[in-house]
Regions:
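TM-loop-TM module centered on a large, flexible mid-protein loop between adjacent transmembrane helices
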Residues: 89-92, 96, 128, 201, ...
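Membrane-helix boundary/coupling elements in multi-pass transport proteins
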Residues: 83-84, 106-121, 225-238, 293-332, ...
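Helix-loop-helix connectors at the membrane interface of multi-pass transporters/channels
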Residues: 4-12, 89-92, 119-139, 171-174, ...
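Membrane-interface "cap" regions at the ends of multi-pass membrane proteins
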Residues: 1-46, 50-55, 68-72, 83-84, ...
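Extracellular loop-to-transmembrane helix junctions
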Residues: 20, 43-138, 254-257, 261, ...
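Helix-loop-helix junctions that connect adjacent transmembrane segments
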Residues: 14-19, 56-57, 131-134, 166-300
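Membrane-interface loop-to-helix entry segments
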Residues: 123, 136-195, 226, 249-253, ...
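C-terminal membrane-solvent junction of multi-pass transporters and transport-like membrane proteins
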Residues: 164, 333-344, 383-436
């Protein structure tokens, strides 16, 4: 299965089954950062602040803490066997072919749905500069651009993600710096409110909405971390993975503190949490207070953030299809690479699915309600993927203790933290039953596994036998 796949270095001529290690440490670090900073931070943080107040800071820290251990488990597994292309490979190897099948296709589905949402968002943001541009023309242009750039080389994907992530970083650092200056200079808003760190505890304390508000924050905040595992799909195309992957994963806590915690502290220090409008971006509102041309600036940042997410989706779905096809769990055509060592057919198929979904949304706006539920289902399914990573780690510790002993990148508190993280995911699922919209999505989620199960029984096993 996995050992049949050979990953060659850049200077070697690729074969039909080889991926090139063209992603450098610089690419991997920024891909990891880009994966950890979603569009939700820019657009959804207003809602999370209004739900939980200052306690939202602890919510992001707790989720980030848990996911750091998921990423450490993934890192140790990927480095235990450099033949692994992604987490679906080690799931198949350690838990059985069914696990690779369910993980690979679930991850593919998650990113296709997320990609559709991103493309629709990009077309909406593009209206800011091109108000007369037709939605379907804009969508087609975006998808063709992403396809064209990804078909070029894996290095092109790395370069795009590098600059997309850099834009997000600059925007967040600018917000933190501007906010700090406003606090230090005792900036006063037009309504007479003075910027101060005291807003964090003076306006009802750290938990103004009580424990229920604190818990409500988890329901939305956990979705902001979707994509944090993306670096795991680059393993087969990373130069010097033994150095690059640990470096990228180890910096996750610093990134979360800087990009989530510091940004939220600054936002709630300049504007008291009770004055934050849920439907508006707190980032935009802060820049508006200073008098900067925030509308165009933030529109550009959020557009590139959505483009980064869509780009990541196109990349990861094609690599998942490639791995599944290599293992006999997807059509053989997806196992073929182009002359540039890119899974071109997988890329084209994923982009066709993106385009089909976007066209359906635009032709029939009534589908949007169902689509909103599907995106929530997709976010829930990401938690399934994270859980499979943890289950794979437990199987690895049980079946291959010698590899763990030899590992230079051991997961801290390995077995214990696997169970703690899985208990946390169960806790989040219980919280999702408390709200009507997320409860409906949770009830629909088993349908995906029924479909996958049918596919496994009728097609997956047969391909595997061949």
């Amino acid at each position: 299965m996995v050992d049949q796949v050979k990953v060659v270095a850049d200077e070697q001529a690729p074969t039909e089954q080889s991926l090139r290690r063209n992603l450098t440490n610089r690419h991997i670090q920024l891909i990891a950062i880009g994966g950890a900073i979603g569009t939700g931070l820019f657009m959804g943080s207003g809602k999370t602040i209004s739900l939980a107040g200052p306690s939202i800071i602890f919510v992001y820290m707790i989720i980030g803490f848990m996911l750091f251990f998921v990423m450490r488990a993934m890192g140790e597994l990927l480095l235990s066997n450099l033949e692994y292309k992604s987490f679906s490979d080690f799931a198949a190897d350690l838990l059985g072919p069914w696990a690779g099948y369910f993980t690979g296709w679930t991850y593919w589905f998650c990113w296709v749905v997320t990609g559709m949402a991103d493309v629709v968002a990009i077309t909406a943001y593009a209206q800011f500069w091109f108000p007369g541009l037709s939605d379907w023309v804009a969508s087609l242009a975006v998808i063709l651009l992403l396809l064209g750039l990804n078909l070029a080389t894996v290095k092109m994907f790395g370069e795009m993600e590098f600059w997309f992530a850099m834009i997000k970083i600059v925007a967040i650092v600018a917000l933190i710096v501007v906010g700090l200056v406003m606090v230090l200079m005792h900036f006063q808003s037009p309504t007479g409110v003075e910027a101060s760190f005291a807003h964090l505890w003076n306006d009802g304390g750290w938990f103004p909405k009580g424990i229920s508000g604190f818990f409500a924050g988890f329901q939305i905040a956990v979705f902001a971390f979707v994509g944090i595992e993306l670096v795991g799909t680059t393993a087969a195309e990373t130069k010097d993975p033994e150095k690059s992957l640990p470096r990228a994963i180890n910096s996750i806590p610093i990134r979360i503190i800087m990009f989530y915690v510091f940004a939220l502290i600054v936002i709630m220090s300049v504007t008291p949490w009770s004055s934050v409008v849920p439907s508006k971006s707190p980032f935009v509102e802060l820049f508006v207070l200073v008098g900067l041309p925030a509308a165009g600036l933030i529109n550009f940042v959020v557009l590139t953030s959505a483009a980064s997410s869509a780009n990541s989706g196109v990349f990861s779905t094609s690599r998942m299809l490639f791995g599944l096809a290599q293992d006999g769990q997807a059509p053989k055509m997806f196992a073929k690479l182009s002359k540039r060592a890119v899974p071109a057919k997988g890329l084209t198929f994923s982009c066709m699915c993106l385009l089909g979904g976007v066209v359906m949304l635009m032709v029939n706006p009534s589908v949007i309600a169902a689509f909103t539920m599907i995106t929530t289902v997709s976010a829930i399914l990401f938690m399934f993927v994270w859980t499979i990573i943890l289950c794979s780690y437990l199987a690895y510790r049980r079946k291959r203790p010698q590899l763990h002993e030899q590992s230079k990148y051991k997961m801290p508190l390995g077995k214990l933290m696997c169970w703690v993280c899985m208990a946390f995911f169960v806790f989040v699922l219980v919280l999702l039953t408390l709200e009507a919209d997320t409860r409906e999505a949770l009830m629909v989620t088993p349908l995906w596994f029924v479909l996958l199960g049918a596919g496994w029984l009728f097609a997956g096993k047969k391909r595997l036998a061949k």
